[in-house]
Every structure is written in C-alpha cells, then in structure tokens.
Amino acid sequence: MAQFVFESDLHSLLQLDAPIPNAPPARWQRKAKEAAGPAPSPMRAANRSHSAGRTPGRTPGKSNSKMQTTPSKPGGDRYIPHRSASQMEVASFLLSKENQPDNSQTPTKKEHQKAWALNLNGFDVEEAKILRLSGKPQNAPEGYQNRLKVLYSQKATPGSSRKTCRYIPSLPDRILDAPEIRNDYYLNLVDWSSGNVLAVALDNSVYLWSASSGDILQLLQMEQPGDYVSSVAWIKEGNYLAVGTSSAEVQLWDVQQQKRLRNMTSHSARVGSLCWNSYILSSGSRSGHIHHHDVRVAEHHVATLSGHSQEVCGLRWAPDGRHLASGGNDNLVNVWPSAPGEGGWVPLQTFTQHQGAVKAVAWCPWQSNVLATGGGTSDRHIRIWNVCSGACLSAVDAHSQVCSILWSPHYKELISGHGFAQNQLVIWKYPTMAKVAELKGHTARVLSLTMSPDGATVASAAADETLRLWRCFELDPARRREREKASAAKSSLIHQGIR
C-alpha cells in the first residue's frame, strides 16, 4: 500500500500540472482580480444606481476635468534682450571699473582716450549700454565686415558692400605726351590741385596742364645744368606749388603770378617726396630724414624726423592732420604724430612686414586710422593697417611692383599702379580686397598716380613717356550735383600770406 502511494505522488510530480504551493499567482489570475475591483461600499452603490440610466458623455474611467489649452498670446512681462546689443566685454569693463580709484585726468587726455576708443572699438565705451531695449540691432561701423553682421543686422546692406554693376572704361579717356620724364621709382613727379590743374615734372622743368581749358604752361626750368625736379606737391587750398629738386632744395611757387616765393635749403640730398598739412610742408630726402617747414615764418625748418636709414620715397599726411606716414627704401613704414611727445619725434608705429621699398602710401579718406601701403619688386604686396592698434588688417599679393595707391571715397575702392610685367592699374574693393578691374595700356612701368579733385579721374605717369587719364570713378549726375554743392559751401582755410 505504501508503495502505491509513493508511485501516485511521483506520478503527480512528473505531470507538472498541479498548483505549486507558495507560488505567485498566474497572470490570468491577476487580471481577473483587477477586473473584479474592490468590494462596493454602500455609498458607491447608491451613486451607481442613481446614474445607471444616463449615457456617459466621455469614455468611462476618464477624468471629466477641463482640458488645458495653450494661450494665444505670450505674457507681456517677459524680457528677452538682443544678443547684438549685449556688449559683454564692455559690461565686464564697466563693472570692474567701479572698484578702481578715480584718477583725475585733464580734458585733453580724456579727449585723446575717447578718440582712441572710437577708433579701436567703433563706439564710445563711456556711453555704451550693457543691455538695451531696441527694435533693431545697431549697424556695424562703415567698412567693417564680419560674419555675424549678416546674422544680426536687419538694416539694408550699405553701398560699400553692395555689388556694383557700373561700367568702368578699359581705355584711357585721354593720352598726353610726357617727354623726358625720369624713369626713377623713388620720385613723385605728378600732382593734381584742387583748382583742376595737373603739375608734371619732366626732367629739369615743371609743366602745368589745365584740365578745364586744356592750356599748357611751363612754370619753371632748373638753372643749373644737371639738376632735375624730383617731386611736386600742391597745397590743399590755394595756388601754391612745392617743388623738390635734386640739389636738395625745396622751392615754393605762386602759380597765378608764376613767381618763386622762396627757396628753402635744409636737406643734404635730393628731395623725392613732399606733402602738405595746412601751412606745414613736410619733405623727405635721400638721406632718410624728414623735415617740417613752416612756410609762414622766416626760420622755416621747425622739425627733423629721423626714422629711416635710406631714401624716403613715400610721404602722406592723414586727412585729419594728426598722423604722418612715411615709406622708405629701407622697407619700413613709420607713422609719426603731428606734434612731438615727451621723448621728442618718435614714431607711433613702425611696420616691418614689407620686403621691398615702400613708395605707395595712402590714407583712407573715411577712416582716419586706416593706412594702405605697397611694396616694391622684392615685396609686391598691398597691406592695410590699423595705425592705432598696429594690426595688419589685410594683405594681398599684387604679383608686381606697387608704385602708387589711391583711395576712391565714392565707391569705397582702391586703385594701384604697377610695374613689370603688365604695367597695369588695378581697382580693388575695400575691405574684401577683391579685384574689380584691370586697366592696361602702358608699355612701361607706372611711376606715379594722382586723382582729380572731383575724384572721378585718375592720371597715371609711366616710363613710356605718356600720361594717361582714366575715368574709372565717374559719378552719376545726382551724386555729382550734391558734391558740387558741398564743395561750393567750403571756404578756404588759408588766410595768412606766405612770405
């Protein structure tokens, strides 16, 4: 009997269909238990009997609370600042400045620091706002290009950045003969006056050509045999012409009277570059020295600048008269102040990146701290500088000798004259320095460039003994009339006689 019970228990275990003691309930058991729910209470039963005859309006078991909707308009109390108007660097500076002691400064020093801040930052730090409520972000300074400008600026693209489709003649408007012009890279032999008179130095003579009437006049001829004219420069306002000679003289001529007013001798070598700053005439010599002449007084030589070891072949005053740029055969570019500092006449900046002689020197007319320079055959580069920070803003390989650079304020462009191998003039777009056009026609290297007073015509003197006039910056009639009205309203700044 015991054996039968043992076999029966063994058989039931092997079948595996009997419930396992203390095992968790099966899934179907759990579902059935959940569907049955808790035992109904009397209150819940009464409510169920009261609503048994009503059709449910929603899915059973779903909450009858009102659905939340998104408001049609956001609240008016949320402030989102413009990123372009949040100047974090200025904010950090202003916050840290509060903890510093206030050092009293003279009004002159404050004005000087304000000018530096405007040139470096593009805005006045003292008047800058950290966060500003505004409808549109402020425009970038004119001539300034960055990738964020496209993203944050909502204003129309300025004319300097907009692509132009103007017609640029590829042929010169007029060709004049320039016999016996000296083929010397270091000389500055042409200049155009505000009275629309072009002065050209041909060996030992200076000729004047009136662009208005076409008349030609010989102003002077050197007295000593072997002497020649090495530079010419018109005063900005007036009828006076400065002439530099190979005999180290600087002559001053009254063009209307065709009379030499004075002969200034302070250099020891030929004078290859001249430039005016009101009544101050600056002259650069082969000795490497720059002299300032006050043409109003008898003792004209008022300053000597010694920053070059070889000939000074490029000399330009800034439009505001605060800086003088000089380029030399020693591959240097110096930026000088208009007045001596505590240490005397010391350059504010010295640029050494050029690998050749620097004759092409030109200041930007609408940005007084921007300077363009061009190198000779060993360098062949055009470089744009910020003279306040000393940074090189851009550099472009011109693939040939750069003899001269001019700025066009009408179209925000530059034009440069070149030597071998194509002897061409090249127009560049600023600040991208993209090539706009090439003007070819000279059969020898270009020596000098000068621009007409209306800014529409460029005259190029070359070693092929020709003077070519290019109307490459012609204005439309409306803009020309506006410029003529502005020019007529200006009065002359020269009220003192030159003696």
Swiss-Prot record:
Region ranges (Disordered): 20-81
Name where it's found.
Cytoplasm, Cytoskeleton, Microtubule organizing center, Centrosome; Chromosome, Centromere, Kinetochore; Cytoplasm, Cytoskeleton, Spindle pole
Instruction: Tell me what PTMs the record reports for this protein.
Output: Phosphorylated during mitosis. Phosphorylated by BUB1 at Ser-41; Ser-72; Ser-92; Ser-153; Thr-157 and Ser-161. Phosphorylated by NEK2. Dephosphorylated by CTDP1.
Q: Does the keyword Ubl conjugation apply?
A: yes
In the record, N6-acetyllysine modifications are located at 66
Residues with Phosphothreonine modification: 70, 106, 157
Q: Which residues carry this modification: Phosphoserine?
A: 41, 72, 92, 153, 161
Q: What does this protein do?
A: Substrate-specific adapter of the anaphase promoting complex/cyclosome (APC/C) complex that confers substrate specificity by binding to substrates and targeting them to the APC/C complex for ubiquitination and degradation. Recognizes and binds the destruction box (D box) on protein substrates. Involved in the metaphase/anaphase transition of cell cycle. Is regulated by MAD2L1: in metaphase the MAD2L1-CDC20-APC/C ternary complex is inactive and in anaphase the CDC20-APC/C binary complex is active in degrading substrates.
Subunit structure comment from the entry: Component of a complex with CDC20, CDC27, SPATC1 and TUBG1. Interacts with NEUROD2. Interacts with dimeric MAD2L1 in its closed conformation form. Interacts with BUB1B. The phosphorylated form interacts with APC/C. Interacts with NINL. May interact with MAD2L2. Interacts with CDK5RAP2. Interacts with SIRT2. Interacts with isoform 1 of NEK2. Interacts with HSF1 (via phosphorylated form); this interaction occurs in mitosis in a MAD2L1-dependent manner and prevents PLK1-stimulated degradation of HSF1 by blocking the recruitment of the SCF(BTRC) ubiquitin ligase complex.
The cross-references to PANTHER family, in alphabetical order and at most eight, read: CELL DIVISION CYCLE 20 CDC20 FIZZY -RELATED, CELL DIVISION CYCLE PROTEIN 20 HOMOLOG
Per its record, how is this protein called by name?
A: Cell division cycle protein 20 homolog
**Gene behind the chain:** CDC20
